[in-house]
Amino acid sequence: MRVVLDTNVLLAAFATHGLCEAVLEQALASHQLVLSEHILDEVGRHLAGKFRMPATRAREIVRFLREQAEVVEPARVGPGTVKDSTDLPVLGTASAGACDLLVTGDAEILRLREFTGIPIVSPRECYERFAR
């Protein structure tokens, strides 16, 4: 299964652990993680800024993710799909990566339920799907 993990899921995986960490581990072990430079840049910026992680550690995490994932250029997504334009590249990543699943904790993206035929699920829903 080809899976995009949104920035918020990756941040939770590395900053707070728990469910999102388990989802990331499952994605890496049994599925193909698909990311974009947009998502990787957000992860690095927020880990070092918002989560006050040392910059060297944040860079190591981004490097690790880049090595483990297939990194794609997001497809263009028309404005108006979601209110927050910074969410458009996340949807575009799922589309460009021909993904089977987009995992996010973002309520606005979750409201879409699917995008171009790609199911959009919460980390909990993803965890349950992976457990099947």
Regions found by a protein language model. Give the residues of each.
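Acidic, PIN/NYN-like endoribonuclease modules and their adjacent C-terminal/linker elements
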Residues: 88, 97, 101, 107-132
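Hydrophobic side chains within alpha-helical segments
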Residues: 9-11, 45, 90-92
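Amphipathic coiled-coil/heptad-repeat helices and related helical stalk/stem segments
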Residues: 19-20, 58, 86-87
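Short, active-site-adjacent cap segments at secondary-structure transitions
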Residues: 10-11, 41, 109-111
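Short, well-structured N-terminal submotif of metal-dependent ribonuclease cores
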Residues: 1-35
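PIN-domain endoribonuclease scaffold, especially VapC-family toxins
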Residues: 24-81
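Active-site neighborhoods of divalent-metal-dependent phosphate/nucleic-acid chemistry enzymes
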Residues: 67-102, 107
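A secondary-structure boundary/capping signal
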Residues: 6-7, 35-36, 105-106, 122-123
